[in-house]
């Protein structure tokens, strides 16, 4: 029985919850409704939870209130994607409820889950049932009921998991698209994974990391970033040190947590990856020999590498002395756009964007990524263009915590971002620009072409794995094995008699022959439509389209 949870135990709950989510991230990704190759829910929740875990591991406290503040900060700044932001808000409310406590009982644990739900619902502009919010709400309500007749936090957590699982299984009955595709909600599944890890910790058990076979021929390719290091002497740990150790039968038994703790004493930038046979280590240290000696306790050293980072920094300085380096741009009003592909970034820059953050479907920038750009620009005002529905909440979260006056234009696609930026008026106020830029989003129809990562049926369209898919906004309107056929079906849905301009943004995987045939087809079928073609260089999507 566990009647009280202190900071030490809560830290272990967080660590085991994060590990269980990490182990199941691919499974959560596979539950995404749309078969586009982004797999964002599991990935984003995992990265968000990992950020919280790392903050906790670096700032351990026996006081649960203090630890909760640390955890909440890590989640807030590391939140990626809408699922990650919602996860961060669930635990923001949870941790706020325990901030004055040194330890909590089952009743306060239940109340904190409920406080998290209330915070998360307030953070979402239009809450949708049948999602992670529903699973969290049902689990919290069950916790409140159960806490009335048990003081055992283990028993409470077991009941929470039972009810969360029941809620998860019911999500297809609340959200029609889940039922059509035949899956449960991916975010709800991710949350359940975290709760299951919590229970493991309460029982004194450990979630083992998934074992993956390691490539014994490859080291970590560490490109050292010296931004912010002015003098070579400022580098505290001067040697980038890497080793591979093959475990020996008569050597010390390998325990990853103990290994990490011991290795962390030698320096920073620690990375440890292991399987049943070997462990790979990367660390920045002053004493490479001590690292190697420590590794020999566990087995045979099979590969070693040491690089002198101070010498590398001296070389960087020598090169920079011969190359004019532009200063980081500071502006009164920062226009920050999220972009994918060099060509698209150049389009945004040419239209007046002051700062570009690389990101998109496969890698949503975190709240912290956006905050850093705003802070480094030293701007008084900031306009953020997410250009992706899954980056919208992280953008809003960033805007809410910076000192600058910041607004988010709700652009959900690259074409919408371009249209909004076209409306920016340097002489207008921030609120005037926000209004006219947001209004322009409604005047553009966005489309895209990509491929399917699995078989499914959605929006009444049969989709086969690896087939091409044409989407208008988020709706799949065409899917064929032939790329040109899919494109023409998509454009027939997008174009109308009153369409004036069609913009085509070409991705890095587009084939020139398909592009040429597509342009010829457009000119034949829609001779009155003006066609603008740009090289975008975006991954995942062969084409982006916009119609005005």
Swiss-Prot record:
DhaL domain boundaries: 8-200
Domain of life (superkingdom): Bacteria
Molecular function GO terms recorded: glycerone kinase activity
GO annotation terms (biological process): glycerol metabolic process
Transmembrane segments: none
Pfam families hit by this protein: Dak2 (PF02734), FakA-like_C (PF13684), FakA-like_M (PF21645)
InterPro entries membership: DegV_domain_contain, DhaL_dom, DhaL_dom_sf, FakA-like_C, FakA-like_M, YloV-like
Protein name: Uncharacterized protein SAR1202
Organism of origin: Staphylococcus aureus (strain MRSA252)
